[in-house]
């Protein structure tokens, strides 16, 4: 018989210790990975609920199993809130991840071998936008576009490539681009060649929900996102559209039964909570601070003589190009990590080094903002990072910085 007082600590000491260690790491490290965030205890409560027990293949009102009347309510809430949040007519909340959502779009709209125009991974795109090592690059004919010498998306190149190659789909969106995307211009290019326009807004979904970054939903045929990152919900995916029932049916079929079986109802409940949180005024204030903190960090890096790809940021992230500093991204990642500052190494445009080494680091502000960092805190943090990068290998600088990190983490806990 199951008892409510069963717990991991008493039953599985090894696993409990690992969880506790990760909890301490999150509290005592400054998190600057742009794709990470801290979700709320309410979301975690939903994910730890009895909904994890329920199998619910199908969609609300059209399930293959009985006993789904209450999980139907949960999924319907998530759908309605997602549509309200992003101004969409259609939402599918079942994808287990952003990559699964993207896969569903490919399967719904394309045939194997079709031509797709997507942002080059080396210029800020995502694996699922056509990388040769990903399903998208293996199954489809990918034509990459990139950024110009000023670090801006080259729309003239995009249009020329579209006219030349006649893609069936054009992808907007990114994993490492710090500027504003012109969704309307991209749709014009897609319409010119009769292509679908698909946007992956995973990185900026929270900013879009708050109105501090342009919304692609009115422009794209279909939009996908993750539900974590800037949206600060559970790890999962979401598909949105305003383009009519025929497309909605194709998308639903591509998710189930095309790509997945039973949905994760406990995660969908977490999504419903996160969407409700994102509709609150406080969420809009948070997202404005996310952008302000990223800008404050960029200003300090520039003042200290560092090169920022695109020269600025208009969202939550930016890339520091370390080529001129003769520091690899891998080395910078390790040095900053020694001071409890977590970043990720990242390729920069025209990077001479391999993706396993790289010449840059990607920095994001969602997590530090979530725990209460001000613009002054963000500026100081960027300065500490420059101190380490200016003095690579100097353990005294690392130890002094680590002490500052531990102090501010204690002052601004993730979960108070």
UniProtKB/Swiss-Prot annotation:
A Pfam entry, by short name: SHMT
Keyword Transferase: yes
Chain sites annotated for binding (6S)-5,6,7,8-tetrahydrofolate: 121, 125-127, 245, 354-356
CDD domains: SHMT
Record field: catalytic activity: (6R)-5,10-methylene-5,6,7,8-tetrahydrofolate + glycine + H2O = (6S)-5,6,7,8-tetrahydrofolate + L-serine
The enzyme's E.C. designation: 2.1.2.1
Annotated pathway: One-carbon metabolism; tetrahydrofolate interconversion; Amino-acid biosynthesis; glycine biosynthesis; glycine from L-serine: step 1/1
This protein's name: Serine hydroxymethyltransferase
Annotated source species: Aliivibrio fischeri (strain ATCC 700601 / ES114)
């Amino acid at each position: 018989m199951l008892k409510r007082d069963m717990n991991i600590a008493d039953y599985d000491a090894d696993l409990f210790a690992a969880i506790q260690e990760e909890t301490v790491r999150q509290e005592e490290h400054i998190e600057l990975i742009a794709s990470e965030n801290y979700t709320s205890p309410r979301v975690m409560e939903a994910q730890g609920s009895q909904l994890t027990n329920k199998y619910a293949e199908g969609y609300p009102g059209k399930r293959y199993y009985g006993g789904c009347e209450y999980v139907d309510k949960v999924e319907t809430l998530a759908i309605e809130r997602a549509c309200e949040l992003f101004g969409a007519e259609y939402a599918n909340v079942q994808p287990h991840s952003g990559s699964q959502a993207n896969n569903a779009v490919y399967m719904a709209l394309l045939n194997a071998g079709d031509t797709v125009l997507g942002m080059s991974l080396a210029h800020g795109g995502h694996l699922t936008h056509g990388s040769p090592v990903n399903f998208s690059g293996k199954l489809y004919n990918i034509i990459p576009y990139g950024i110009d010498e000023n670090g801006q998306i080259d729309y003239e190149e995009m249009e020329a490539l579209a006219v030349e190659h006649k893609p069936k789909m054009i992808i907007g969106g990114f994993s490492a681009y710090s500027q504003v995307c012109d969704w309307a211009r991209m749709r014009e290019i897609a319409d010119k060649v009769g292509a679908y326009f698909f946007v992956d807004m995973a990185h900026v979904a929270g900013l879009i929900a708050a109105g501090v970054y342009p919304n692609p939903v009115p422009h794209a045929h279909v939009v996908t996102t993750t539900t974590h990152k800037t949206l600060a919900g559970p790890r999962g995916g979401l598909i949105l559209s305003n383009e009519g029932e025929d497309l909605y049916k194709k998308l639903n079929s591509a998710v189930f039964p095309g790509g997945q079986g039973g949905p994760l109802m406990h995660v969908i409940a977490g999504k419903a909570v996160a969407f409700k949180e994102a509709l609150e005024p406080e969420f809009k204030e948070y997202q404005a601070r996310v952008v302000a903190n990223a800008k404050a960090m960029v200003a300090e890096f520039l003042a200290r003589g560092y090169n920022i790809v695109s020269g600025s940021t208009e969202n939550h992230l930016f890339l520091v190009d370390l080529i001129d500093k003769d520091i690899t991204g891998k080395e910078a990642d390790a040095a900053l990590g020694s001071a409890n500052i977590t970043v990720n190494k990242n390729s920069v445009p025209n990077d001479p080094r391999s993706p396993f080494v790289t010449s840059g680091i990607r920095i994001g502000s969602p997590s530090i903002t979530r725990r209460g960092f001000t613009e002054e805190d963000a500026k100081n943090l960027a300065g500490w990072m420059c101190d380490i990068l200016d003095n690579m290998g100097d353990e005294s600088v690392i130890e002094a910085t680590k002490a500052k990190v531990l102090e501010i983490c204690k002052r601004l806990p993730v979960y108070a």
